[in-house]
């Protein structure tokens, strides 16, 4: 009898241990992120990824540096048309924020084990840590700030070491935002490739707390996963092209699409970028007429593919360059921006203002970090390579004035 009791006790203990271990194994985790997208003066989007289907939400605190556990915080859920999304990709757009203010935040996910009819069975939670670490923070944009500082990286094609080297050349504590100007990968075939290719590194270095604005390059249009890109970048925006203002700088971020004709055999009949750029030009025309654009001391155009120019090199007059020249540049020449920032060419090029085009076009190389510090009267532009050398540095004055090399 005693043996039977001992056997039953051991059996029950074994079952309990097994169930506990299975529960531990099956706990949901946040696999990537969180990171910031489309931060504006009164809104911000936060994105994170989980390993299991779940609902997700953000808790936001604007009450200084006290404990995050001091009081309950409002929850902002990942929803679509009034329904909480069950997904492994979560994106929450928080509105009604105050310009130039710091916010602390925490992201959550709760696994959805089963959903049938009116019955939903939930599983365990996952969240960012606010017990052993300080909560993540971000600042909303402040259009009234007297100055701003930002950096741009492009064309790293999945080279994480290069990205880390370049980002080490800037003081992130004095950087308001980061521009990724396209071709951060050579193609996109999976979510795993996107994060291992550069985004996990970006999150580790800065992207959870410093806004990152993304301009799609022609290589992000390639691969079976290319159609999914807006689930990760600008996920709560209507388009992949958009505009924002930080301090004296108003940025218009364009999506220049592919670099060859839609009919090229390389695209296998899957692209329609000529029409896409035409539709985008209509949006651009309206933005250039906006009060926000006209009132900004400095206007910067961000576009991966540079326009075709008269003195173009052998790789500056492809179809994509011509499309940018024909569909975007006529509008820009009438609106007098101060600067156009591009990538794509894998080398540094600077086309100064001419009688035809009143603003310079600066093409950053694939192995350099471009850094800009702007006040209401001038912009200082520096280009640094991964070794910290600064081959280019000059000051750019307001539109219609000249650039002075330093």
Predicted feature locations:
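Active-site-proximal segments of metal-dependent phosphoesterases and phosphodiesterases across multiple
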Residues: 267, 273, 292-339
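Short beta-strand segments enriched for Tyr within beta-sheet-rich domains
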Residues: 48, 100-109
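Extended active-site neighborhood of metal-dependent phosphoesterases/phosphodiesterases
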Residues: 108-137, 193-293, 327-331, 350-375, ...
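Active-site neighborhood of phospho(di)ester-bond hydrolases with catalytic His/Asp-centered motifs
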Residues: 152-154, 178-183, 212-218, 301-303, ...
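Non-catalytic, glycine-rich low-complexity segments
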Residues: 22-55
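Conserved small/polar residues in nucleotide/adenosyl-binding loops
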Residues: 395-402
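Active-site environment of divalent metal-dependent phosphoester hydrolases
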Residues: 158-162, 186-189, 216-225, 259-262, ...
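N-terminal active-site segment of His-dependent metallophosphoesterases
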Residues: 40-43, 54-57, 67-77, 82-83, ...
């Amino acid at each position: 009898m005693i043996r039977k009791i001992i056997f039953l006790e051991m059996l029950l203990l074994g079952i309990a241990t097994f169930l506990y271990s299975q529960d531990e194994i099956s706990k949901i985790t946040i696999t990537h992120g969180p990171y910031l997208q489309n931060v504006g003066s009164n809104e911000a989007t936060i994105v994170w990824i989980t390993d299991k289907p779940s609902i997700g939400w953000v808790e936001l605190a604007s009450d200084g540096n006290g404990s995050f556990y001091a009081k309950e915080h409002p929850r902002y859920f990942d929803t679509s048309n009034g329904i909480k999304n069950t997904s492994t990709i979560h994106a929450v757009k928080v509105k009604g924020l105050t310009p130039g203010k710091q916010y602390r935040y925490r992201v959550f996910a709760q696994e959805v084990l089963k959903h049938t009819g009116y019955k939903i069975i939930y599983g365990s939670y996952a969240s960012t840590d606010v017990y052993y670490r300080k909560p993540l923070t971000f600042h909303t944009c402040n259009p009234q700030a007297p100055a701003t500082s930002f950096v741009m990286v492009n064309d790293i094609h999945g080279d994480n070491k290069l990205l880390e080297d370049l980002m080490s050349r800037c003081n992130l504590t004095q950087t308001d935002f980061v521009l990724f100007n396209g071709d951060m990968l050579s193609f996109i075939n999976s979510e795993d490739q996107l994060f291992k290719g550069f985004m996990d590194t970006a999150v580790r270095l800065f992207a959870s707390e410093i806004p990152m604005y993304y301009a799609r390059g022609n290589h992000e249009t390639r691969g079976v996963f290319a159609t999914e890109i807006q689930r990760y970048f600008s996920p709560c925006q209507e388009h992949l092209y958009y505009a924002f203002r930080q301090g004296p700088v108003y940025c218009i971020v364009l999506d220049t699409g592919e670099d060859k004709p839609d009919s090229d055999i390389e695209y296998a009949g899957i692209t329609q970028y000529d029409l896409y750029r035409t539709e985008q030009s209509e949006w651009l025309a309206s933005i250039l007429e906006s009060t926000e654009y006209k009132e900004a001391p400095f206007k910067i155009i961000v576009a991966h593919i540079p326009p075709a120019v008269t003195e173009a090199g052998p790789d500056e007059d492809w179809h994509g360059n011509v499309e940018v020249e024909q569909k975007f540049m006529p509008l820009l020449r009438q609106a007098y921006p101060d600067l156009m920032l591009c990538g794509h060419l894998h080398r540094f090029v600077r086309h100064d203002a001419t009688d035809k085009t009143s603003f310079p076009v600066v093409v950053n190389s694939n192995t350099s970090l471009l850094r800009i510090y702007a006040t209401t009267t001038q912009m200082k532009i520096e280009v640094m390579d991964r070794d910290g050398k600064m081959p280019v540095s000059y000051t750019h004055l307001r539109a219609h004035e000249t650039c002075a090399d330093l």
